[in-house]
Structure formats: structure tokens, C-alpha cells
């Protein structure tokens, strides 16, 4: 019997690169060799949607996207509020796996980390992984709003039935913040590469 797929979100981050033939590169992170799902593979950042990703608290920390607006983009989720959860999960998982966070202190510019903030947010990542803090609590504590309106819904894919671990994944595309750098956590991810879509 096929495994039931879990709801998940994936974020394809792009950056402008003048010397690239296509003009853009996309981010891939390498999954840890001991990961249960696709060990050692280069993938887009992403993971399972959690209940906390579509609570009222989650809606409050989103900029430019409400439960209703998310449902207009992604219909048919159960419960309906889960539509927003896909957006939040894409940002949260990218933060956990790549250290990049699409969020504002003051719009319209996505935050840039100072050296002190890099250290602080690295600690936050460890605390989120250990369930010491929720992602939403960190966002509120830092006075941030998630840049959910900068995520463009791109595709919906379900892992084939032959896989013992399956995901019902929504894919999003966004521009990578120019003043943040990828920091793999050595737990979920061990390396990264920016690569031309042609490859």
C-alpha cells in the first residue's frame, strides 16, 4: 500500500548573475547523507507543512497575504487555512535549511543580516530545530513580517507511489535577498550550489 503523502512546501530561490548565459541562477542545497528522504541529493529548500504554519499567529506575521488571499491562490486545502501554511512553511524551511529568511523590518526591503544578527539567527535556527522556540515566536520577537507576497506559486507535485516517504508539495519561486548568504546547518543540509537552470 502506498504511503500517504504529507503536505509540504518548496522554495526555488533565484538570483541575478550577469555572467550567466541565462542571467539567473537558482539555489540547491545538499541534503545530509543520513537524511531519511533523498540522502545526499541536491534539492530546493523545503519540507513538511506544520500546524503552526497556518494558525492565527502565523497570519499575523505575514505581510501582504491573508488566509483568504492564500486560498484564492491555492484552493482545495483542508482545512482552508492551510493554504497560507504552504507559504509560511516555504519561508520557514528555507530559513532552517539555508539560513535565508524572506522577511521585512521595514518594507519594501528584505532584511540584511549584520554580523551580530547572523550569530543570533544561527542560534534561532538551532532552537527551532530543537522545538525550543516556534518560528512565529522568533519572527515576532525580532519585529519582522514574512515577505509572503514575494512568493509566486509555481507548481504542485506529489512524490510517486513507489517512494516509502511521500510529499504533496507546492512549489514557489522568489528572488533571493541580495544581502543574505546561504548558511547550511550541517544537520539537514551540508552544502549548497547556485546553478544555471540550463544545467
Cite the ranges covered by each PLM segment.
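N-terminal leader/linker segments that precede catalytic domains of diphosphate-processing enzymes
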Residues: 1-199
Amino acid at each position: 500500500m502506498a504511503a500517504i503523502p504529507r503536505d509540504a512546501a518548496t522554495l526555488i530561490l533565484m538570483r541575478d548573475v550577469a555572467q550567466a548565459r541565462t542571467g539567473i541562477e537558482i539555489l540547491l542545497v545538499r541534503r545530509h547523507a543520513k537524511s531519511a528522504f533523498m540522502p545526499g541529493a541536491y534539492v530546493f529548500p523545503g519540507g513538511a507543512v506544520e500546524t503552526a504554519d497556518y494558525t492565527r499567529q502565523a497570519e499575523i506575521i505575514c505581510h501582504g497575504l491573508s488566509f483568504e488571499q492564500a486560498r484564492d491562490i491555492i484552493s482545495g486545502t483542508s482545512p482552508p487555512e492551510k493554504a497560507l501554511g504552504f507559504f509560511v512553511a516555504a519561508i520557514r524551511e528555507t530559513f532552517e535549511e539555508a539560513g535565508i529568511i524572506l522577511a521585512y523590518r521595514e518594507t519594501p526591503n528584505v532584511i540584511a543580516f549584520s554580523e551580530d544578527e547572523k550569530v543570533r539567527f544561527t542560534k534561532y535556527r538551532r532552537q527551532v530545530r530543537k522545538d525550543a522556540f516556534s518560528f512565529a515566536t522568533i519572527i515576532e520577537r525580532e519585529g519582522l513580517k514574512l515577505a509572503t507576497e514575494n512568493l509566486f506559486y509555481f507548481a504542485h507535485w506529489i512524490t510517486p507511489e513507489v517512494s516509502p516517504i511521500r510529499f504533496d508539495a507546492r512549489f514557489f519561486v522568489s528572488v533571493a535577498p541580495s544581502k543574505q548568504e546561504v548558511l547550511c546547518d550541517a544537520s539537514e543540509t551540508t552544502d549548497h550550489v547556485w546553478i544555471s537552470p540550463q544545467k
